[in-house]
Design a protein with these regions (language model features):
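The feature marks the mature, well-folded catalytic cores of soluble enzymes
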Residues: 1-122
Length: 122
C-alpha cells in the first residue's frame, strides 16, 4: 500500500476453481479490466464495478479451460494470454487491444499461466 501509494481493496472469491485473484481478474488499465463474474461474491462485484468504468466478462469456459483470467496487460495496449480463448480475444480486439497468444499448457497443468510466468521490475 505504501510502496505504490494505492488503497488495498479486499475481494472475496467464492469458487475453488478461482483460487487466486490472478485467475479471474485482469486489469487492462486504470479504467478497464477483464473478470470472471461467477468467481466473486456480490460485495466484491460491487467493489469491482466502482473501481473500473469498464468491466469485460471473461466467458467462464475460457477461464476454466484456457486460464483466460490469467492474462497480463503490461502497457494498456497489448494483452498476453494463453492461446485458444477466441471469445475473449474477440472482446479485446473490439476494444482496440492487441492480443499476443502464447502456449502455456504445461504451466496450466501446474495451476498457472501467463500472469504467473512474468517478471516485473520497478
Amino acid at each position: 500500500e505504501d510502496h505504490f501509494n494505492l488503497d488495498i481493496i479486499p475481494l472475496k472469491l467464492k469458487r475453488e476453481e478461482f483460487y487466486h485473484l490472478d485467475t479471474c481478474l485482469v486489469p487492462i488499465d486504470s479504467a478497464t479490466a477483464l473478470f470472471v463474474e461467477s468467481a466473486f461474491d456480490k460485495e466484491s462485484l460491487v467493489k469491482l464495478q466502482h473501481g473500473f468504468e469498464n468491466l469485460i466478462p471473461i466467458p467462464e469456459d475460457e477461464a476454466l479451460k484456457n486460464f483466460a483470467g490469467n492474462a497480463f496487460c503490461p502497457d494498456g495496449h497489448h494483452v498476453v494470454m494463453q492461446s485458444g480463448s477466441k471469445k475473449t480475444m474477440k472482446l479485446l480486439g473490439q476494444l482496440g487491444l492487441e492480443v499476443l497468444e502464447v502456449e502455456t499448457s504445461e504451466f496450466i497443468k501446474g495451476g498457472g499461466s501467463v500472469f504467473c510466468l512474468k517478471g516485473m521490475y520497478f
